[in-house]
């Protein structure tokens, strides 16, 4: 019988992490918790009630930058990546081990609908690839590489992966978008984009360079930004059924297109040798 390892990468999540851990207890074979840098609240004390497999990793500010370390520590081939503000629905808890027995499956996606306070505002969108085989996945330790690229069959399930942040808003509000996406995340990704490929840790990645989109953005940041922005806008609208899910999909398409415009300009600014924090001060975009 194939078993499942689940891991959480957290940063001072004492208000949320116990709910996530409770949903895993008695369901998966192994629970691992990793903290992004030193912990200043009770996150790790809470985690110790559920597992002794706890690690404190160097502070990097993005969970994606710790995924390879977490995957390597998991003992089972099947891994489940859970955020501290997520938890398994009852239906998913009952079926997760059954999913692991499918020999043809390499990964599973789950419904991850947006919520506003206590109500869902989408039904079947977005979806999240949270469960996958270590032997079939590949990663680059790169901001934004939050989901694995997997070989083989990915099965889109109807099971619900609950996402309920402490603020009660399970999607990027405008203020969050400006602060995180256009601020910290956008600037971070721009800096990483210009780093040499050899400086990145990889996991089962069979190429000798970044994906083509990243290479184009590195070389032609300003020219490519509008193109990537338009493509992302159209892809989200048509791939994620805007007619069924409504305005949240449209809003996400607009935000993503804006993000790609800013990202291209951030890369351009850095290539000129200018300081991003002077061009875009923290009190404006971060």
PLM feature spans:
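Conserved donor nucleotide-binding strand/loop of the catalytic core
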Residues: 29, 44-73
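Acidic helix N-cap motif at the loop->helix transition within catalytic regions
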Residues: 18, 39-50, 91
């Amino acid at each position: 019988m194939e078993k499942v390892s689940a891991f959480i990468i957290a940063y001072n999540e004492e208000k949320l992490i116990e709910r996530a851990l409770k949903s895993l207890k008695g369901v998966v074979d192994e629970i691992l918790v990793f903290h992004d840098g030193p912990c200043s609240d009770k996150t790790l004390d809470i985690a110790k009630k559920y597992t002794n497999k706890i690690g404190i990793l160097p502070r990097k500010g993005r969970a994606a930058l710790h995924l390879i370390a977490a995957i390597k520590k998991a003992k089972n081939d099947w891994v489940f990546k859970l955020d501290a503000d997520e938890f398994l629905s009852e239906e998913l808890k009952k079926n997760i081990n059954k999913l692991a027995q499918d020999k043809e499956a390499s990964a599973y996606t789950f419904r991850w609908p947006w919520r506003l306070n206590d109500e869902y505002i989408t039904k079947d969108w977005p979806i999240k690839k949270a469960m996958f085989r270590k032997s079939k996945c590949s990663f680059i330790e790169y901001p934004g590489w939050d989901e694995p690229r997997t070989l083989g069959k990915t099965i889109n399930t109807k099971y619900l992966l609950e996402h309920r942040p402490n603020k009660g808003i399970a999607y990027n509000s405008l203020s969050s978008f400006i602060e995180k996406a256009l601020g910290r995340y956008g600037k971070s990704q721009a800096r990483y984009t210009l780093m040499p490929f050899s400086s990145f840790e990889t996991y089962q990645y069979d190429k000798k360079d970044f994906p083509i989109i990243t290479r184009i953005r590195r070389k032609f940041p300003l020219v490519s930004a509008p193109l990537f922005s338009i493509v992302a806008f159209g892809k989200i609208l048509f791939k994620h059924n805007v007619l069924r899910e409504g305005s949240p999909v449209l809003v996400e398409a607009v935000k993503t297109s804006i993000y790609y415009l800013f990202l291209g300009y951030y890369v351009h600014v850095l290539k000129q040798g200018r300081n991003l924090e002077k061009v875009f001060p923290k009190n404006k975009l971060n």
